[in-house]
């Protein structure tokens, strides 16, 4: 309510800042520290390996939703650093694997998938990005609708898979991830609550679809969008787990340990003397894990990898 008036008076801005800080202090204050941070100053939480239709890993006690203001407190032990790796444009690259669209797979050879897609569509990069994300997450109106028509002509195989998934969802038929995990839908539209549900853990998706409601188009449309999301994000979760398991084995010889899995991001704690080796192992693990999961090397997966001392140093 007050946000539109933030700059109208210094008191309004101060009040809004206080409310934000007070919310963080209430949620992550002394009680939270006493309950969840141990005597060794480490935060631990129970993990769920396959949560919701997307099958993502989730964790309790704030591990998956720690505010940015607290991330400077997540620091490596003396003599150690973090190797932080974040998968880039993971959902569209997964779509290339799941659909078997060779033209779309060719676009993944680029570090920035949206650039070759834009060239093929004859549009600019922002429009191409909106079109790809809208195809996966449901927006069909406005600028996205016009760009989608171009996308369907350019990549009919990939778009065909999404259309079939949508039709299965509308009909209440179950769908499967690329790895074969069954996702039951039924006739009742699922509720998109919880950070592990399809569409809620993909920051790029929210940028493309805005505030689109699950109620748009009714229950049938909700099931259709859900099925489409579940296949892509569920398959992406499978790849991420294969990557994490491969990284775990790869960094063990140099004393590295995975300390956090967050959406598409890994944080590896490693002795500083072996940081470069661990970073290389993380990159190598992505290539081997993606080939094993996809059964092909035609689709390229990329990760932004950096060596940092505090989690807050990671590039957003």
Place the predicted regions along the sequence by residue.
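Conserved catalytic core of nucleotide polymerization and phosphodiester-bond processing enzymes
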Residues: 1-316
């Amino acid at each position: 309510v007050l946000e539109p008036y933030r700059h109208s008076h210094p008191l309004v801005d101060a009040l809004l800042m206080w409310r934000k800080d007070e919310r963080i202090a209430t949620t992550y204050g002394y009680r939270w520290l006493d309950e969840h941070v141990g005597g060794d100053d480490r935060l631990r939480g129970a993990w769920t390996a396959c949560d919701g239709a997307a099958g993502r890993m989730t964790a309790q006690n704030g591990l998956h939703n720690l505010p940015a203001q607290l991330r400077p407190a997540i620091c490596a032990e003396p003599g150690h650093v973090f190797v932080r790796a974040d998968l880039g444009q993971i959902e569209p690259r997964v779509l290339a694997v799941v659909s078997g669209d060779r033209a779309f797979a060719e676009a993944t050879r680029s570090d920035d998938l949206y650039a070759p897609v834009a060239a093929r569509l004859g549009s600019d990069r922002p429009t191409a990005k909106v079109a790809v994300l809208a195809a996966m997450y449901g927006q069909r109106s406005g600028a996205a609708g016009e760009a989608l028509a171009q996308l369907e002509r350019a990549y009919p195989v990939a778009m065909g898979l999404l259309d079939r998934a949508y039709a299965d969802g509308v009909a209440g038929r179950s769908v499967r991830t690329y790895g074969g995990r069954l996702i039951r839908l039924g006739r009742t539209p699922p509720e998109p609550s919880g950070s592990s549900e399809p569409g809620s853990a993909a920051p790029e998706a929210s940028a493309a679809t805005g505030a689109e409601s699950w109620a748009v188009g009714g229950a049938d449309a909700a099931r259709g969008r859900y099925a489409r999301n579940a296949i892509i994000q569920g398959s992406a979760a499978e790849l991420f787990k294969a990557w994490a398991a491969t990284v775990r084995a790869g960094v063990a010889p140099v004393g590295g340990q995975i300390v956090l899995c967050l959406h598409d991001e890994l944080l590896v704690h490693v002795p500083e003397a072996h940081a470069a080796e661990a970073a290389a192992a993380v990159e190598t693990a992505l290539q081997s894990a993606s080939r094993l999961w996809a059964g092909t090397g035609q689709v390229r997966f990329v990760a932004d990898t950096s060596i940092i001392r505090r989690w807050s140093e990671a590039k957003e």
